[in-house]
Each structure stands twice: as C-alpha cells, then as structure tokens.
Curated annotation (Swiss-Prot):
Record keywords: Calcium, Glycolysis, Isopeptide bond, Magnesium, Metal-binding, Mitochondrion, Nucleus, Oxidoreductase, Thiamine pyrophosphate, Transit peptide, Ubl conjugation
Major subcellular location class: mitochondrion
Residue positions binding Mg(2+): 410, 443, 445
Protein name listed in UniProt: 2-oxoglutarate dehydrogenase complex component E1
Binding site for Ca(2+): 142, 155, 157
Subunit-level organization: Homodimer. The 2-oxoglutarate dehydrogenase complex is composed of OGDH (2-oxoglutarate dehydrogenase; E1), DLST (dihydrolipoamide succinyltransferase; E2) and DLD (dihydrolipoamide dehydrogenase; E3). It contains multiple copies of the three enzymatic components (E1, E2 and E3). In the nucleus, the 2-oxoglutarate dehydrogenase complex associates with kat2a.
Length: 1021
C-alpha cells in the first residue's frame, strides 16, 4: 500500500468507487502482516469487504489496531481478536457487546455493520478520504498561492486538479457528500495532519490539508521512491503548528530584510546608472541563504561553497559572505585602476573567500563564493568539484563538514543542459558531494522571455525530479514561510545527504538590468509590480501589528544600516587602486609569497632514480593482492610491462604510470577522471583490475606503491564532458598540491565542454587572478577513423594562447620557466613516452600552476618505435621543448637541404618515409614538443644549425587546422623573416578528417611526397 503509483498529471473525473477499484494495492515490505487475510482455505464470500479492492483499508485498520486496539472501532477490535485466534474471516466478525450509555450508538453501528451495503460504504468512504489526503500530497502544490503578484500560477496552469477539494461540490469526486463533512474518519499512517489525534472530521481534514499544501508553500515530493524520506517530509509540513517563530527569530528576520533591501537602495542612490543586477523583488534571498547557513552550521558544517549568477550577487557578497562594503563600492569607481596582472572581470562576476564567526551558532564558518562567467549555470559543476575536493582534503567522507549551495535563475535552471549534467553527478561515488541545497530565484521571467515560452515543464525546477530531490516552492513575499522552508531544506541535506531545491517564487522589480525597460515586453506584469509593496514594508507592518517591534525600532534598524553603508562609502573614497586578488575565491595559503608571487622561478629536474623507476614498473606489471584472478589478456599485458622493465624501456602507459606513481610518493594526490579512464579508451592503461571470479572486486595497484603515499583516485565519469570537466576544474581549484587530470574519450569530444575551456580554463587567471593546474589529456591523431575520431582541434587551443607571435620574448636566465609563468596555458604534443613522463611531473614541480593541454597519441600507444629508455628519465633529465635531429643529418648540417619541423605522431611517418627514400642525410626533422609557449630560443638554435636548408612545417592535419597558423608567424619571427616557411600537409577542409580510408591514405601519400620533394617549392614565393 505504500507503493501506490498515481499519475502526476491531472486526473480525469472518476467516481470514488471507480478510483478505488482502479488502484493496485501492493503489500508493504514491513515484517508485520495479517496472514489470515492472505492464506485462506475456506470461502470468504460472506465478507466482501476483505476483497482486494478494500484490503488496503483493512490492513491500515489492522496496523492501527496492533499499535493501539482502542484506536479503531470496537467491531474491528473484536474482528481482529477473533481472526488472530484462528477464526475464519467469515466467522471472525461479531457485533460488539452492549456499551451501556452508548446503546443507541451501538445499535446504530450494529445495524450498519449487519447491513452489507453499509459496510462497503464505510470502507469506501475511508478509502476515499485516504485518496483525498494522497491527492493533496501529490498535487496540492498546483493550487498553492505562490505568486506574490497574483498574476500567474507558478505551474503555468490555472486549472485546479479535479481531486483537490476547493469547494464542497468537488466532494462528489470521491463519492462523498457535504453531509459527510462532519463525519469522523480514521487517519492513515501516511499523514501527520492529526498531530496526536488518530481521527478527525472530514471538514478538519480538508482544512489541515489546505493549510499544509495549498498556502504559501507548495511541496513536491511524492515522486520520491523512499518511504522514509516521504514520511519525513510529510511530518515537516503536515504536523499542526509547525511554522511557529519566536519574537527574537522574527526580529532577526526583519533585520536581515532591512540589510538586503537597504543595500540595493543605497547602490541605486549612489550609482543609479550602473548595472548591478539588483535583488529587488527577491530581497528575501539574503535571509534565506543565511538561514540555510545557520542551520547547516548548527548541524556541524564549517565550510560552505556557493555558486550563483549575477542577479543579487553584490548583495550576497555584502550581506552573506560579508565582503567589506568599501571594496564593493570601489568596484563602481571608474577612475580606479587594478594593480594585479590580468584583465579582471566585472564586479558581478567576482568571487570571494571569507572565514568568520556565525553569530547564531557561535561557530567558525568559512564561506566561498566561486567566481563565474556570464554563461549561466556554467559554475554549477565547478562548485561541486571544489566542494568534493574540500571534503576530500579534510576527510569528510559523508559531507558533514563541507557543503555546497547553488543559486539559479528560473529560466536558466530549466533551459541550460549543464544543470541536468550536474544533477547526475550528485550520487556518483567519485563525484557526490553528499547533497547540495539549490535555491532558485524564480522571478518568473528570463530577461524578456515569458516562462510559457521558456520551458515545457510546469515548473522550472522539474529537472530536479530525476534525482529524487524534494522541491519546496514558496511565495517569496512570505518571509516566515521562506525561513521555514530553508530550515527544512538544510535539515533534509543534513539528514539524508541528498540534493534539495528551494524555489523562491518572486518577481523582478526592475528590468533585466537597471538600464533596461521591461514595459516593452511585460506591460501587465510591470503595472502590477509598480503597485506591489516591498516585502520589507509588508513584513515590518505585520510585526508592528503583532507588537513584535514598534515603528521606532524599525526605523532605527534602517538608520543603523544606512549609516554603515555611508561610512563604508566614505572609506572607499580613500582607495587609490583596485586589487583583484582581494576577490580570490580559492586562496592557497603558503604556496605563494605574501604578495602572491612564486617562491622561485626555477624548476628542478623531473627525472627519477633507477630504483624508483624499477619499483614502480614492477608494481605496474603485477597484482599486489592475493587470490585475485585477472583476465588472461590482461596477464599478457602485465607480462609485457615486466619485460619492458627488465629491458629498461617504457611505452606510453608505463611512462604515465611512473610519472603518476612517483608523485604519489611525494605526497601529491592524483585524480584521473573521464569516460573509461580506468581501463583507457584504447585498453592501454588498466589502472583498475577486476577479479574475474568475484563481482565488483577491484584492485588499484597504484595505491600499493609506497608506505604513507598520497591516495590515487581514478574514476570513470558519467558520459558528460561539460559537467565532468567543470567538476575536475573545481577540484583542481582547491589545492596546488594535487594533480587533477581529465581525459576525453577522444579529443574530438572536448568541444562539448567548450564553455569550461573558453570561460574558465583559458582565461581564469587573467579574469580572477586564480591559477589552476588542471591537465587535459586529448587523444588526437589522423588515423583514418573519420571526422569525429581524429582531431582534438589543436588550432583552437593555440588560437587562445596569449603569447605575441611577432615579439621575441625577453631573454633571461630562467627563459623557459619565465615563458611558462607568463602564458595562460601550456600546450604540448609529445612524441616520446619519456617526454610525456617529464611534462606530467613538471606540472607539479613548477613553482606555480598553469593548465596543461596534452594532445595524446592513439596508435603510438603500441607503436614499436614509440619507446623510451630509462636513461631518458633519470635524475638530471627534463622535459625537452624541442627534440632536435639526432641522425646522420645532424653530423653534416651544412649538407642538409631541408629542415622539417613537426609535432606528434607525424614524426614517425616522416622518418619512415625518409628512410624509404634514403634521405637521412638530406633532410633533418625536428620535433616541437611544446607548442605554447613557443620555444623561440631552441627553434632559432636548430635553424642556425642548418644554414643551407629550406624550412618546412609538416603536419598531418588540414592546413586551416592543426598547428600551421600558430607556428608559421612564430617561425618567421624566430628567423627574422629571412626565409620563407613552407607547408606540407593536408589541404584546407571543412571537416577534420575524411571518412573514407582510401582518401585518407591518398592524402597521407600526397603530403609526404611534398615534404620530401626537394623541388616542391621551387618557383613559389
């Protein structure tokens, strides 16, 4: 009976008996059952009320009788006693004995029970009441009074569900009549409207249901498939007298509303023509957030990480995070210049980190608001990743100390797919943050777009239903209802560690921004808004009428905050410069100097001792757990690794293993995430071993490398790029002493996460003075696999590099490291396992952090020539930005007729072609391993070595793609434009690659011919 399923759509009118008969009653999974009803050897036709259509009600009565025999009618008490004694159902029923003073009542009851139609009616009426209660629980929110303006229904539907009793004539839906309103009905165990009472008159049942579900709070929860959670919510919203606030709580709420409202009014007075995306119309957001934080702090949370869009951001910074007001006001001063490196960002995108005492709980709490772009909802997974990292570093495995709060706009919450992606990370083992509180500022409009044009679902919050998150809709002009809902939301998160949504149904008093005219597109709405009293005024009038505060106290509260703002404004006039670093959302204490500079500009050797290389190699080629049966094919792979270790060589997978394993020894936590990364898309990695005989028994050998090593997290992600890359970026924000890698299944698919790359990874430091060392591993290579499995689009990453192609960087002792410090990200395409090993280790050994983009190979993973010796990985070795020609051509450089620069896999095709043409002495091939920042110094050295050679850039990508457009101007700057730079590669194309194998091979043959035809460019200028 607890598992009834009722469609959420509006029911078509049915009679009560039809409704009852149409329901399928399932037995509860509870241990207590009334077996006599289920195992009968005698006919029971004499008692049709025991049939399946009524069994739900009978079982409800039985459970109530078990708990308290006096809670049911005497006839049921006798029936259950007899039935439990072994009587058949037909014989179990007896009329109750004389009750003396209640003889007439008893006679009436006996006659009713002896009359079979009346017994059926009694049962059907009780079942009808159960259905009525359930209807309110499921659909009561559809008629809740949620819109402060009284214009729209929050669910965009003015129809009232047929089973919600808004007038007495609708009782007929349940087969009830107005005369039944004063009849007393036993309450089922699935409701708490009775409080301590087990039965209520129908009139009172309806009144209490209306009060619980149809006032200023609408509760969506009946889609949740966990009975305990449903019961918990019912108790929170149905129990009588739940929404009681004492006078002190009301005064605190009023003071918070004063701060929220007067802050916006102060900004409007001082900077009336500035965009600030104010909170007018949803001022209750500030006390709402503070309530969630207060309640969570009381439950043990000491770190709250928040993400939000532009709407109300300055108010949140001022009154929730408690950013100094003068620093906020400085952002409005157009004359102040920022002293930090980078370009900065607008004030309503900036983040903040602050530790303070929570005055309600008297406990320390740290608040962080993550900086974000204008791309709505893009910060959602970033916040979740940062939250996960902070939980990881403090050992908070259940989310009891660190939590996330995400704020959303109604249009974006419904419209942006990243919301869905982020929700689906919420319960994944390696991505869960153990519950997020989502607060939707539902101002019922998206810029100029009506919600009826902006979503197909009744509410903007319907996406949350996919993860069984309860949704609490609340009228934002009822501050006490908002506070109650926020308390419940925080308590839900603390109790169940699951997501929850608070939908603040409000309005936007101004246009999209303060300069926008909303009357163009929403004239009727804004006529009503112009008449609408501010929530502060309404609530103040309420408290004054209740005697909680008087007019003088209210005005003093306003004056006190106005004075705070004026004094901060005066102090802001003394500021001479802006500091973006004051708005840092993720500080790294101790990593930089006090003024935020690297502690050195050198990078130590990235090599390892032979002993460490051998040890890691041995672990990588074994199973460090007893009685663990691995797949036969994997046994061959591990055996091959063992042979390589004996021969002191590594392939790509083993080089990666050694780089990561060595960092674990140094206390660096490593997290590798992405689709299929545990095994590797190309079945080369195998960092997680699976027992072939025991389901779900796994082993991660890399966590068995060293005593006291840092943990290694390798996790297959959901089939998402946008959400998962954002999550990993957020994880990398939390600490510089961790290596976070995200690998695309194929490099081609990274563009699904383009927003994270364009708005966070590439410009993050320039906008927010926030370094990040995330590593992107993007499998790339033209191998005849078609246009969607060939290219990681290197041209796009290179286009976004911030180095000047026409300017030679200033020479210095630390030229290479200085270049890395000045760049916005590092782009490499390694051609050897050893160089990949070094660049991964360098990422951590650098004294600062930059994103690293690695175009990783596919065919080279098993290429017999793509091997490196231990000698290339020993102490004193390092990452080679260029690998110069080392063959016969280097022995007679003046005789070399062509110098080919290339990068990545194409090198092996070039060397094979050169060998086949017997041109080793005529053509030198140099590999540019680090594309950005461009190695001007080493390229110059290589060019000067071959004075008689013409210069060719060769790539396997099409001419309008790949590296050519980036490399050519930098090569020309390197040689001071003394020679032309020729191109050998595929012709320009719209698609990254052909899908035809023959065409692929024809293109390959053509550009290899061009590369080695020494007369190919004669006559060209």
């Amino acid at each position: 009976m607890f598992n009834l399923r009722t469609c959420a759509s509006k029911l078509r009118p049915l009679t009560a008996s039809q409704t009852i008969r149409s329901l399928k009653h399932n037995r509860p999974a509870a241990p207590r059952t009334f077996q006599q009803f289920r195992c009968l050897s005698t006919p029971v036709a004499a008692e049709p009320f025991l049939s399946g259509t009524n069994s739900n009600y009978v079982e409800e009565m039985y459970y109530a009788w078990l708990e308290n025999p006096k809670s049911v009618h005497k006839s049921w008490d006798i029936f259950f006693r007899n039935a439990n004694a072994g009587a058949s159902p037909g014989a179990a029923y007896q009329s109750p004995p004389s009750l003396g003073s209640s003889l007439s009542t008893l006679t009436q009851a006996q006659s009713l029970l002896h009359s079979q139609p009346n017994v059926d009616k009694l049962v059907e009426d009780h079942l009808a009441v159960q259905s009525l209660i359930r209807a309110y629980q499921i659909r009561g929110h559809h008629v809740a009074q949620l819109d402060p303006l009284g214009i729209l229904d929050a669910d965009l539907d003015s129809c009232v569900p047929a089973d919600i009793v808004t007038s007495s004539d609708k009782l007929g839906f349940y087969g009830l009549q107005e005369s039944d309103l004063d009849k007393v009905f036993h309450l089922p165990t699935t409701t708490f409207i009775g409080g301590n009472e087990m039965a209520l008159p129908l009139r009172e049942i309806i009144r209490r249901l209306e009060n619980a579900y149809c006032q200023h709070i609408g509760v969506e929860f009946m889609f949740i498939n966990d009975l305990e959670q449903c019961q918990w919510i019912r108790q929170k919203f149905e129990a009588p007298g739940i929404m009681q606030f004492n006078n002190e709580e009301k005064r605190t709420l009023l003071a918070r509303l004063v701060r929220s409202t007067r802050f916006e009014e102060f900004l409007h007075r001082k900077w009336s023509s500035e965009k600030r995306f104010g909170l007018e119309g949803c001022e209750v957001l500030i006390p709402a957030l503070k309530t969630i934080i207060d309640k969570s702090s009381g439950n043990g949370v000491d770190y709250v990480i928040m993400g939000m869009p532009h709407r109300g951001r300055l108010n949140v910074l001022a009154n929730v995070i408690r950013k100094e007001l003068e620093q906020i006001f400085c952002q409005f001063d157009s004359k102040l210049e920022a002293t930090d490196e980078g370009s900065g960002d607008v004030k309503y995108h900036l983040g903040m980190y602050h530790r303070r005492i929570n005055r309600v709980t008297d406990r320390n709490i740290t608040l962080s608001l993550v900086a974000n772009p204008s791309h709505l909802e893009a910060a959602d997974p970033v916040v979740q990743g940062k939250t996960k990292a902070e939980q990881f570093y403090c050992g908070d495995t259940e989310g009891k100390k660190v939590m996330a709060i995400l704020l959303h706009g109604d249009a974006a919450f419904a419209g942006q797919g990243i919301v869905y992606e982020t929700f689906h990370l919420s319960d994944l083992p390696s991505h869960t943050t153990h519950g997020t509180v989502h607060v939707v500022v539902n101002n019922q409009i998206g810029f100029t777009t009506d919600p009826r044009m902006a979503r197909s679902s009744p509410y903007p919050t319907d996406v949350a239903r996919v993860v069984n998150a309860p949704i609490f809709h609340v009228n934002a002009d009822d501050p006490e209802a908002v506070m109650y809902v926020c308390n419940v939301a925080a308590e839900w998160r603390s109790t169940f560690h699951k997501d929850v949504v608070v939908d603040l149904v409000c309005y936007r008093r101004n246009g999209h921004n303060e300069m926008d005219e909303p009357m163009f597109t929403q004239p009727l709405m804004y006529k009503q808004i112009r008449k609408q009293k501010a929530v502060l005024q309404k609530y103040a009038e309420t408290l004054i009428s209740q005697g909680v505060v008087n007019q003088l106290e209210y005005e003093e509260e306003i004056s006190k905050y106005d004075k705070i703002c004026e004094e901060a404004f005066a102090r802001s006039k003394d500021e001479k410069i802006l500091h973006i670093k004051h708005w840092l959302d993720s500080p790294w204490p101790g990593f930089f100097t006090l003024d935020g500079q690297p502690r050195s500009m050198t990078c130590p050797s990235t090599g390892l001792t032979e002993e460490d290389l051998t040890h890691i190699g041995n672990v990588a080629s074994s199973v460090p757990v007893e009685d663990f049966m691995i797949h036969g094919g994997l046994s061959r792979i591990l055996k091959g690794r063992g042979e390589m270790v004996k021969n002191r060589t590594v392939d790509w997978a083993l080089a990666e293993y050694m780089a990561l394993g060595s960092l674990l020894k140094e206390g660096i936590h490593i997290r590798l995430s992405g689709q299929d990364v545990e095994r590797g898309t190309f079945s080369h990695r195998h960092h997680v071993l699976h027992d072939q005989n025991v389901d779900k028994r796994t082993c991660i050998p890399m966590n068995h490398l060293w005593p006291n090593q840092a943990p290694y997290t390798v996790c297959n992600s959901s089939l998402s790029e946008y959400g998962v890359l954002g999550f990993e970026l957020g994880f990398a924000m939390a600490s510089p002493n961790a290596l976070v890698l995200w690998e695309a299944q194929f490099g081609d698919f990274h563009n699904t996460a383009q927003c994270i790359i364009d708005q966070f990874v590439c410009p993050g430091q320039a906008k927010w003075v926030r370094q990040n060392g995330i590593v992107l591993l993007l499998p790339h290579g033209m191998e005849g696999m078609g246009p969607e499995h060939s290219s990681a689009r290197p041209e796009r990453f290179l286009q976004m590099c911030n180095d000047d192609p026409d300017v030679w960087p200033k020479a210095s002792e630390d030229f290479a490291v200085g270049q890395l410090y000045d760049c916005n990200w590092i782009v490499v395409n390694c051609s050897t396992p050893a160089n990949f090993f070094h660049v991964i280790r360098r990422q951590i050994l650098l004294p600062f952090r930059k994103p690293l983009i690695v175009f990783t190979p596919k065919s080279l993973l098993r290429h017999p020539e793509a091997r490196s010796s231990f000698d290339d990985m020993l102490p004193s070795t390092h990452f080679q930005r260029i690998i110069p020609e080392a063959g016969p051509a280097s022995q007679n450089p003046e005789g070399v007729k062509r110098l080919i620069f290339c990068t990545g896999k194409v090198y092996y095709e070039l060397t094979k072609e050169r060998s086949g043409r017997d041109m080793e002495g005529d053509v030198a091939i140099a590999r540019v391993e680090q594309l950005s920042p461009f190695p001007f110094d080493l390229v110059e050295k290589e060019v000067q070595k071959y004075p008689n050679a013409d210069l060719v850039w060769c790539q396997e990508e099409h001419k309008n793609q790949g590296y050519y457009d980036y490399v050519k101007p930098r090569l020309r700057t390197t040689i001071h434009r003394t020679k032309p730079v020729w191109y050998a590669g595929r012709d320009p194309a719209a698609a990254p690659a052909t899908g035809n194998k023959k065409t692929h091979l024809t293109e390959l043959r053509r550009f290899l011919d061009t590369a080695f035809n020494l007369d190919a460019f004669k006559g060209h200028f």
